Amino acid sequence: STAVVTDGQMEPAFDLDAELHFQPTTWPGARLPHTWIFRESNGDKVSTLDLCGHGQFTLFTGIGGEAWREAATQVGADFGMAINVHVIGPRQEYVDHVGDWARANEVSDTGCILVRPDHHVAWRADELSEDPKSELARVMNTILAR
């Protein structure tokens, strides 16, 4: 499917029967794993799944991925759509106190994960690209078949 752009890595091997068990991964094409994170402002527990969907693409990044936020804003404007962005890390809107997101996301703090409105991972980057806006625009062009 062109609605998924792989990152060049092989699909992870399943430890258990994939037909019977869910194995959390952010490999493109997989459903975004659920992890609990916490809203920095009030400590409320929030699922990563509740932060995406709602008819929009969502981009998750870490404390070193601020350039992805800027790229998503610019690319979203170019495409005439909003791309929601959530930075998860210390002193950000959402924090990962127990480390569940850090264990599940499979990218560095400068990388990102782009999630489709149906909660499936469309693409991920392990680290910050030299030109995040161009990279994200290329990915969105592929996903949206433009």
Can you name each region flagged by the protein language model?
Residues 1-146:
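Helical substrate-recognition/capping region of FAD-dependent monooxygenase/halogenase enzymes
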